[in-house]
Amino acid sequence: MNSIQFPLLDRTAQNSVISTTLNDLSNWSRLSSLWPLLYGTSCCFIEFASLIGSRFDFDRYGLVPRSSPRQADLILTAGTVTMKMAPSLVRLYEQMPEPKYVIAMGACTITGGMFSTDSYSTVRGVDKLIPVDVYLPGCPPKPEAVIDAITKLRKKISRELYEDRIRSQRANRYFTTNHKFHVQHSIHTGNYDQRVLYQPPFTSEIPTEIFFKYKNSVSSPELVN
């Protein structure tokens, strides 16, 4: 364009055109409209409820809480996760569309907290079930800390590359009742192998030779009589 023939158009065009990349535009739109799925099970979730008030006003970050995982791209776990709740949490995470993010809020969610000491029914860290993007320690964390975690997640989203999101395929991590871990690729059907989740401890810990020898010795007539 000849700036001599159109001087006014040249001056206004410089203030109206924004040059950016498709990746940056996608990141900007996602970090400005995070829709969280609130997974609160304990007292830490009460601190997150304080963000809804006018003092902190979490609406300025574009957060819109959703009740369905299919409409959410962020799951915020707060509180203790038990072994019976582990399959439900994994199922909720798998139902969320990509890209999706996780914020672990509170000591009980991150490490199991005081409930994980000599406990057979508490998951020792939610990162053993689903991948966590931001850890938020505290018992419970303050609302200011929750805002700081959301800010850090927004910075992480702004630096993401589309190629890296396509290349990274996350797998399901199954947590058994014996605190053993199994990795299996996602099939996106919502169905899970209950035999893997609830396998009996005696068949997996006792060797085969000793197990059958023990059965034969108990069922022998000499020991029964």
From Swiss-Prot:
Keywords annotated in UniProt: 4Fe-4S, Chloroplast, Iron, Iron-sulfur, Membrane, Metal-binding, NAD, NADP, Plastid, Plastoquinone, Quinone, Thylakoid, Translocase, Transport
Entry-linked InterPro entries: NADH_UbQ_OxRdtase-like_20kDa (IPR006137), NADH_UQ_OxRdtase_20Kd_su (IPR006138)
Protein name as catalogued: NAD(P)H-quinone oxidoreductase subunit K, chloroplastic
Protein family according to the UniProt entry: Belongs to the complex I 20 kDa subunit family.
Organism lineage string: Eukaryota, Viridiplantae, Streptophyta, Embryophyta, Tracheophyta
Entry superkingdom: Eukaryota
Comment on bound cofactor: Binds 1 [4Fe-4S] cluster.
Function comment: NDH shuttles electrons from NAD(P)H:plastoquinone, via FMN and iron-sulfur (Fe-S) centers, to quinones in the photosynthetic chain and possibly in a chloroplast respiratory chain. The immediate electron acceptor for the enzyme in this species is believed to be plastoquinone. Couples the redox reaction to proton translocation, and thus conserves the redox energy in a proton gradient.
Subunit annotation: NDH is composed of at least 16 different subunits, 5 of which are encoded in the nucleus.
PROSITE patterns assigned: COMPLEX1_20K
Cofactor needs: [4Fe-4S] cluster
EC number, UniProt record: 7.1.1.-
Organism: Nicotiana tomentosiformis
